[in-house]
């Protein structure tokens, strides 16, 4: 009888062949788990040992759950939908799929929930594919510096805290200070680019509503429809009535939809309104899952919650198609406290912040942007050269005006230079005011700010500044339209444009009537009072008589 020999090489080859040809099949060995505890949107499930992190689970009634906690003996899952019908003892099955959402151009003009299902009653959405919610952000080599401007249409932002495509710019402030209005204005301002039909100019927009009132979301949708902006916008809605799981997932759903366009070489803008409520929803989920609480009862990974979300906004390299995803996260503060936990986290992640102040808002300065602490760290590289030329001293002038204004409040006597600076500062503040949902094209912003920063408005009463600006822009549009065309064509204020502007504003002042009936171009002599009249009597000039001389006979 021959001796049986086992060769290690043969065993190794057989194992390698088996491993290389093995494909896991969920259907062939279906795992079934059971609910051991359910309540408050959370379910604990025993069994299902092969479950993946962030895998979708299906309960008996068809409701989906998301596996978040993978413990030795049980799974902690957040229920994505109504949880009243889920009870202890019910069976749970794996789907074998990580959470993903449908994406594509079919989402433009639609309102969807965080799972990509339509909420607007307009029928099913035809998707181009699916994209995982948890996806790795672009690496360093896949990015390039921000260099293209994204115009918001708001003068104070485009001039002093410019935003570029691929940037993350935080909008922060107390409630009712106009944070959402700034974001909606930015979306509305993309309409001209959309109507151009040029894919290099077009920006597709996503508005993510997290924990907002249903009436607020409806008002935003109505404003976008009225402005003709809904056709290039998607709304991802997770209202206050939704479970915490939906509020936690909504920003990732919006990012997945936006990243689909970014990786196709297109440009997208996403608004997260607001991430404070997402952090609160994640805190509720984490506490219910019995994760250890940290500062302000938030879990230890709340920074990672926002960093991995906002890092997905990027300007891709040319090799990757050159697409971009610009992020406008919104954070709500309490009592203007920007040093709280979540605000400081997001400030450190983003590329700058626009700080809106309650006092400015209540005093009628809208948008209520505090230019002193608002900053854009990278947007200046993408700013139009013409805007840089006119806005170079704007921030400094406004800062000096605020300082002088506080000093003048004590009733101190000011010299002529300080008074002139106060007068110009008041006109600049008035010039930067802007009605809601009325963004300005960049060429009109340049002309307005040129007039303010070069002293052309110094003789216009403060109460007439906004009317003067509106009428002057209309005058330039009708009589000197070549100025706007030249600014858009060259991107800068050339000497010819400046001379044309000086001529145009001099002509316009000849026709502009102030609120008190004066024409700026006509200088009237001041009327004299009675005391001056007495001293100004006209006297007839009598020349002195010459002395007479007698001739004597000689």
UniProtKB/Swiss-Prot annotation:
Annotated membrane topology: Peripheral membrane protein
SUPFAM superfamilies: C-terminal domain of alpha and beta subunits of F1 ATP synthase (SSF47917), N-terminal domain of alpha and beta subunits of F1 ATP synthase (SSF50615), P-loop containing nucleoside triphosphate hydrolases (SSF52540)
Cellular localization per UniProt: Cell membrane
EC number(s) on file: 7.1.2.2
UniProt keyword annotation of rRNA-binding present: no
Pfam families: ATP-synt_ab, ATP-synt_ab_C, ATP-synt_ab_N
Record field: catalytic activity: ATP + H2O + 4 H(+)(in) = ADP + phosphate + 5 H(+)(out)
Gene Ontology CC: plasma membrane; proton-transporting ATP synthase complex
EC primary class: translocase
Keywords noted in UniProt: ATP synthesis, ATP-binding, Cell membrane, CF(1), Hydrogen ion transport, Ion transport, Membrane, Nucleotide-binding, Translocase, Transport
Record-level Gene Ontology MF annotations: ADP binding; ATP binding; proton-transporting ATP synthase activity, rotational mechanism
Family matches, as InterPro entries: ATP_synth_asu-like_sf, ATP_synth_asu_C, ATP_synth_asu_C_sf, ATP_synth_F1_a_nt-bd_dom, ATP_synth_F1_asu, ATPase_a/bsu_AS, ATPase_F1/V1/A1_a/bsu_N, ATPase_F1/V1/A1_a/bsu_N_sf
Gene3D superfamilies: 2.40.30.20, ATP synthase alpha/beta chain, C-terminal domain (1.20.150.20), P-loop containing nucleotide triphosphate hydrolases (3.40.50.300)
PROSITE patterns, alphabetized: ATPASE_ALPHA_BETA (PS00152)
Binding site for ATP: 173-180
Coiled-coil stretches noted in the UniProt entry, renumbered to this chain: none
Stretches the record annotates as Disordered: 531-554
Site note Required for activity, residues: 374
Principal subcellular localisation of the protein: membrane
NCBIfam families in the record: atpA, PRK13343.1
Family: Belongs to the ATPase alpha/beta chains family.
Subunit relationships: F-type ATPases have 2 components, CF(1) - the catalytic core - and CF(0) - the membrane proton channel. CF(1) has five subunits: alpha(3), beta(3), gamma(1), delta(1), epsilon(1). CF(0) has three main subunits: a(1), b(2) and c(9-12). The alpha and beta chains form an alternating ring which encloses part of the gamma chain. CF(1) is attached to CF(0) by a central stalk formed by the gamma and epsilon chains, while a peripheral stalk is formed by the delta and b chains.
HAMAP family from the UniProt entry: ATP_synth_alpha_bact (MF_01346)
Entry function: Produces ATP from ADP in the presence of a proton gradient across the membrane. The alpha chain is a regulatory subunit.
Protein's recorded name: ATP synthase subunit alpha
Record gene name: atpA
């Amino acid at each position: 009888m021959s001796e049986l020999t086992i060769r290690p090489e043969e065993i190794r080859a057989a194992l390698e062949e088996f491993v290389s040809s093995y494909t896991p099949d969920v259907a062939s060995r279906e795992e079934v788990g059971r609910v051991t505890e359910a309540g408050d949107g959370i379910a604990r499930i025993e069994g299902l040992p092969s479950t993946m992190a962030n895998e979708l689970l299906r309960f008996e009634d068809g409701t989906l759950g998301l596996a978040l906690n993978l413990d030795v003996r049980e799974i902690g899952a957040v229920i994505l939908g109504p949880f009243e019908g889920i009870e202890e003892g019910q069976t749970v099955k794996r789907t074998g799929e990580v959470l993903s959402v449908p994406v594509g151009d079919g989402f433009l003009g639609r309102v969807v929930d965080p799972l990509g299902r339509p909420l607007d009653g307009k029928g099913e959405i035809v998707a181009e594919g699916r994209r995982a919610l948890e996806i790795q952000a672009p690496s360093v080599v896949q990015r390039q510096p921000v260099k293209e401007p994204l115009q918001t249409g708001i003068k104070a932002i485009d001039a002093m805290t410019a935003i570029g495509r691929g940037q993350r710019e935080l909008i922060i402030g107390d409630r009712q200070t106009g944070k959402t209005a700034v974001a909606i204005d930015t979306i509305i301002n993309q309409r001209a680019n959309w109507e151009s039909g040029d894919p290099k100019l077009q920006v597709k927009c996503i508005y993510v509503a997290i924990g907002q009132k249903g009436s607020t979301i409806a008002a935003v949708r109505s404003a976008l429809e009225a402005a003709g902006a809904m056709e290039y916008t998607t709304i991802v809605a997770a209202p206050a009535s939704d479970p915490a799981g939906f509020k936690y997932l909504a920003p990732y759903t919006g990012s997945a939809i936006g990243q689909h366009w970014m990786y196709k070489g297109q440009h997208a803008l996403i608004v997260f309104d607001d991430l404070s409520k997402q952090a609160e929803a994640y805190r509720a989920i984490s506490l219910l899952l019995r994760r250890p609480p940290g500062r302000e009862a938030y879990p230890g990974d709340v920074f990672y919650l926002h960093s991995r979300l906002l890092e997905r906004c990027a300007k891709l390299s040319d090799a990757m198609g050159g697409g971009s995803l610009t992020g406008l996260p919104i954070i709500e503060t309490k009592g203007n406290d920007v040093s709280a936990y979540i605000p400081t986290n997001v400030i450190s992640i983003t590329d700058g912040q626009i700080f809106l102040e309650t006092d400015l808002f209540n005093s009628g300065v809208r948008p209520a942007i505090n230019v002193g602490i608002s900053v854009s760290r990278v947007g200046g590289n993408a700013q139009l050269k013409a805007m840089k030329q006119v806005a170079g001293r704007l921030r400094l002038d406004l800062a000096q005006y605020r300082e002088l204004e506080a000093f003048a409040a004590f009733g101190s006597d000011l010299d002529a230079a300080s008074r002139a600076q106060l007068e110009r500062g008041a006109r600049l503040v008035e010039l930067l005011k802007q009605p809601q949902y009325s963004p300005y094209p960049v060429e009109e912003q340049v002309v307005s700010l040129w007039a303010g920063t070069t002293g052309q408005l110094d003789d216009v009463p403060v109460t007439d500044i906004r009317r003067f600006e509106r009428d002057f822009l209309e005058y330039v549009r009708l009589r000197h339209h070549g100025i706007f065309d030249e600014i858009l064509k060259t991107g800068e204020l050339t000497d010819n444009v400046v001379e044309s502007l000086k001529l145009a504003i001099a002509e316009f002042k000849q026709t502009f009537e102030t609120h008190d009936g004066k024409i700026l171009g006509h200088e009237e002599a001041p009327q004299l009072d009675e005391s001056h009249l007495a001293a100004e009597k006209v006297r007839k000039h009598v020349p002195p008589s010459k002395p007479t001389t007698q001739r004597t006979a000689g």
